[in-house]
From Swiss-Prot:
Subunit structure: Heterooligomer composed of large and small subunits.
Species this protein is from: Bartonella tribocorum (strain CIP 105476 / IBS 506)
Enzyme class of the recorded protein, top EC level: hydrolase
Gene: xseA
Official protein name in the record: Exodeoxyribonuclease 7 large subunit
Sample GO molecular function, one term: exodeoxyribonuclease VII activity
Role description: Bidirectionally degrades single-stranded DNA into large acid-insoluble oligonucleotides, which are then degraded further into small acid-soluble oligonucleotides.
Family, similarity comment: Belongs to the XseA family.
Keywords recorded for this protein, A-Z: Cytoplasm, Exonuclease, Hydrolase, Nuclease
Length: 476
């Protein structure tokens, strides 16, 4: 620092520096003076890791605030993820950021300030979720008795998945789907939540079958190791799941928030496998036992009803005794029917004989003639009616023809019939009288008209009309 000041002294006692020189000098002083430090404070402004994987937040107490940064490589190695409001002890190097004239700590290790801080945070979350009703027993779903497919959310390389698969294979071999996740570290909570949501999003008839049950499992560990299963995203994903979920996180004494929201909590991953599937051999023994009991019950029922049938048969009369009375009645009815037929035959024969005596050939001929007379009368009447109808049709045709040729129809169309004094029609101009009266006949009456103009004068005013030929017919 002395060398820097001595180099920049020029004629006065005030040193002159560039901004970069001052910032660099301060950075070197801070880093050389403090080196690695341990800082206790409360995390503030944490919003999760950046897209680059780095995390930026601040450590504060009641009087001061210190900016902090965790690089991506360190974030992936943390035993528990940072959370807003958590009191921690950060280990790292103090440095400055020349671009904004800030000093900060680059964290290389981060630990909560004892288990008490984590337990306080855990209890606060537990109380919050309980008030929202996420832990209600009435909302938990029943587990399927014999699932076809089981989905397991755990690490694919740990002993947990081997124990689960081995236990399921021993009890009831079936299809197991594994969704690999990190079960410890910064991203464990988000990965477990995504796995639960992913299993629920599978199609029932898709290429990857949808499981009937989900097991979320992890081995034992410290509170920090299991902290990812206390993540809010995990709790809400399990609560929103349509598939029943068994939680098997840690040992029997380890409780996480997923254990409260899951539909069933198993003390160990092996216990989860035992709860998920029954023992196939026990089912076979049970089915065999039920089959044997069913066969014995059917045999006893058959024997009982057979004994009742034998007892009833002993109480019944023999076939001869049973049919003797009906047979006697049948014989009596047969004999009575035969006698009745004979009597009826004799009566009919006597009746026919009496009718025969009453009949004679002359009477038969008279009846035959009457039948012929009736038949001829009917035929004559029908012929007469046909003739009458034929004449009526001809008369109607003549009437229609007469009506069509009548001059009355012509008068109705607006024509006038001119009649002379002798009441004969005037057909030609030459027949028109030179003086006197004529009669004009309309369709609805006659009118008398006197001719005042001489016939010769009337003829000269009109063009001569060609007289019709003699072979032309007349309407009158």
């Amino acid at each position: 620092m002395v060398n820097l000041l001595s180099e920049k002294t020029s004629g006065t006692n005030v040193a002159e520096f560039t901004v970069s020189e001052i910032a660099g000098a301060l950075k070197r002083v801070v880093e050389e003076k403090f080196g690695y430090v341990r800082v206790r404070g409360e995390i503030s402004g944490y919003r999760g890791a950046h897209a680059s994987g780095h995390a930026y937040f601040a450590l504060k107490d009641d009087k001061a605030r210190l900016e902090a940064v965790i690089w991506r490589g360190v974030m992936e190695k943390l035993k528990f993820p940072p959370e807003e409001g958590m009191e921690v002890v950060a280990v790292g190097k103090l440095t400055t950021y020349p671009g904004s004239s800030k000093y900060q700590i680059v964290i290389e290790a981060l630990e909560p300030t004892g288990v008490g801080a984590l337990m306080t945070l855990l209890e606060n979350r537990k109380k919050k979720f309980a008030e929202e009703g996420l832990f209600d027993e009435a909302k938990k779903k029943p587990l399927p008795y014999m699932p076809r497919i089981i989905g397991v959310v755990t690490s694919p390389t740990g002993a947990v998945i081997r124990d689960i698969i081995h236990r399921i294979s021993d009890r009831f071999p079936l299809h197991v789907l594994v969704w690999p996740v990190r079960v410890q570290g910064e991203t464990s909570g988000s990965e477990v939540a995504a796995a639960v949501e992913g299993f629920n999003a599978l199609a029932s008839e898709g290429h990857i079958p949808k499981p009937d049950l989900i097991i979320v499992a992890r081995g034992g560990g410290s509170l920090e190791d299991l902290w990812g299963f206390n993540d809010e995203a995990v709790v809400r994903a399990v609560y929103a799941s349509d598939l029943p979920i068994i939680s098997a996180v840690g040992h029997e004494t380890d409780w996480t928030l997923i254990d409260y929201v899951a539909d069933w909590r198993a003390p160990t991953p092996t216990g989860a496998a035992e709860k998920a599937v029954p023992v196939k051999l026990d089912l076979e023994v049970c089915v065999a036992s039920l089959g044997a009991r069913l066969r014995k019950g059917l045999a006893r029922s058959f024997d009982f009803h057979q004994q009742k049938l034998c007892a009833a048969r002993r109480g019944l009369p023999s076939a001869d005794q049973l049919f003797s009375l009906p047979r006697r009645g049948f014989d009596e009815i047969s004999s009575r029917l035969q006698r009745a037929l004979c009597v009826s035959y004799d009566k009919k024969r006597f009746s026919f004989h009496a009718l025969h005596l009453r009949l004679s050939p002359r009477l038969l001929k008279s009846e035959k003639a009457q039948r012929h007379t009736k038949e001829y009368t009917a035929r004559l009447y029908r012929a007469f009616m046909r003739s009458v109808e034929k004449k009526r049709s001809a008369l109607e045709l003549a009437c229609r023809l007469l009506k069509s040729t009548s001059y009355q129809n012509i008068l109705e169309r607006g024509f006038v019939l001119v009649l002379g004094q002798n009441h004969k029609p005037i057909k030609r101009l030459a027949q028109f009288p030179e003086s006197g009266q004529i009669n004009l006949r309309f369709f609805d009456g006659d009118i008398h008209v006197a001719t005042q103009e001489p016939f010769s004068a009337a003829r000269s005013k009109h063009k001569k009309i060609k007289s019709p030929s003699d072979d032309q017919g007349t309407l009158f």
